[in-house]
């Protein structure tokens, strides 16, 4: 049975919400068996396309990957990130968000920002588009924030994040991502906000957690401090590639067990090549 936003909200304070990113059909199919929520994140720009940041990710890219992920799911809620500069007015936000939902079949969109995007969030929610909020460290704002740094370390920054989170919730977001903030602030917001908080680098005080799946699986040697690598796929893949190349070079692959047997037509062709033509 497909989870919906009410199912996610009902888990607040009762059951931790497990979320991961996915960008492809095969990965989404695996995640769907176990995760409550799958985010088609704009982190696809860095993890799949090798971009320096998320700022170059386009709406078409998000829709293409959203389609692939939705095709694979049978249970998890699927949320698609709205890319940079795709929601700077309520009307533009609705135009692009409605396209994402209609073309991918996803359940909701995610917007980065607090007070500055509250109007856009309210505009979408009022028109039937569920929204996931995102405050704290916001990758689309990294130039303004001075890089990818922990947020909320000063009193003014802490207050700003609290105002952002409150504005997002009041605008109608069904849950909110808290990224790279202190454990005490995450705990305070989780207690105060009426909707689930999903942490990424924000401690286990949050109602749920999310990670970039490539980081969690150890597919890169570079990853943030807050990531726990539950596998080491980078070395597993390297070992597999080395083994494959060695087997090819030594003519060990393909073996007889990997080849097809001759059918009647081929046997005739080999015995009487001119007659088989």
Swiss-Prot record:
Molecular function via GO: 3-methyl-2-oxobutanoate hydroxymethyltransferase activity; magnesium ion binding
Superkingdom field: Bacteria
Transmembrane segments: none
Primary localization class, coarse: cytoplasm
UniProt: Mg(2+) binding residues: 42, 81, 112
Active site: 179 (proton acceptor)
Keyword field contains Transport: no
Catalysed reactions, semicolon-separated: 3-methyl-2-oxobutanoate + (6R)-5,10-methylene-5,6,7,8-tetrahydrofolate + H2O = 2-dehydropantoate + (6S)-5,6,7,8-tetrahydrofolate
Binding site for 3-methyl-2-oxobutanoate: 42-43, 81, 110
Cofactor info, note text: Binds 1 Mg(2+) ion per subunit.
The protein's required cofactors: Mg(2+)
Subcellular location(s) per record: Cytoplasm
GO terms (BP aspect): pantothenate biosynthetic process
InterPro entries documented for this protein: Pantoate_hydroxy_MeTrfase, Pyrv/PenolPyrv_kinase-like_dom, Pyrv_kinase-like_dom_sf
EC number of the protein: 2.1.2.11
GO cellular component: cytoplasm
CDD domains for this protein: KPHMT-like
Cytoplasm found in the keyword field: yes
Family note: Belongs to the PanB family.
HAMAP family: PanB
PANTHER family tied to this protein: 3-METHYL-2-OXOBUTANOATE HYDROXYMETHYLTRANSFERASE (PTHR20881:SF0)
Functional note: Catalyzes the reversible reaction in which hydroxymethyl group from 5,10-methylenetetrahydrofolate is transferred onto alpha-ketoisovalerate to form ketopantoate.
Protein name in the entry: 3-methyl-2-oxobutanoate hydroxymethyltransferase
Species per Swiss-Prot/TrEMBL record: Anaplasma marginale (strain Florida)
Phylogenetic classification of the source organism: Bacteria, Pseudomonadati, Pseudomonadota, Alphaproteobacteria, Rickettsiales
């Amino acid at each position: 049975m497909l989870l919906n936003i009410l199912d996610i909200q009902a888990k607040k304070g009762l059951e931790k919400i497990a979320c991961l990113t996915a960008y492809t059909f095969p990965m989404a199919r695996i995640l769907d068996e176990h995760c409550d929520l799958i985010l088609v994140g704009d982190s696809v720009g860095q993890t799949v396309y090798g971009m320096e940041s998320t700022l170059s990710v386009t709406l078409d890219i998000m829709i293409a990957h959203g389609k692939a992920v939705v095709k694979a799911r049978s249970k998890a809620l699927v949320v698609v990130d709205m890319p940079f500069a795709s929601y700077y007015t309520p009307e533009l936000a609705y135009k692009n968000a409605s396209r994402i939902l209609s073309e991918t079949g996803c359940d909701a969109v995610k917007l980065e920002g607090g007070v500055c995007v509250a109007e856009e969030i309210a505009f979408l929610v009022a028109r039937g588009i569920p929204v996931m909020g995102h405050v704290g460290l916001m990758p689309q704002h990294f130039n303004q924030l001075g890089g990818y740094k922990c947020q909320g370390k000063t009193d003014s920054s802490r207050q700003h994040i609290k105002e952002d989170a409150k504005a997002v919730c009041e605008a109608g977001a069904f849950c909110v991502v808290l990224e790279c903030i202190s454990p005490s602030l995450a705990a305070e917001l989780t207690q105060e906000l009426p909707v689930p908080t999903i942490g990424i680098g924000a401690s286990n005080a949050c109602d749920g957690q999310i990670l970039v799946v490539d980081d969690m699986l150890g597919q890169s040697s570079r990853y943030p401090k807050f990531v726990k690598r539950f596998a080491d796929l980078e070395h597993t893949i390297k070992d597999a590639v080395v083994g494959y190349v060695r087997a090819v070079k030594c003519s060990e692959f393909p073996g007889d067990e990997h080849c097809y047997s001759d059918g009647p037509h081929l046997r005739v062709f080999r015995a009487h090549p001119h007659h088989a033509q």
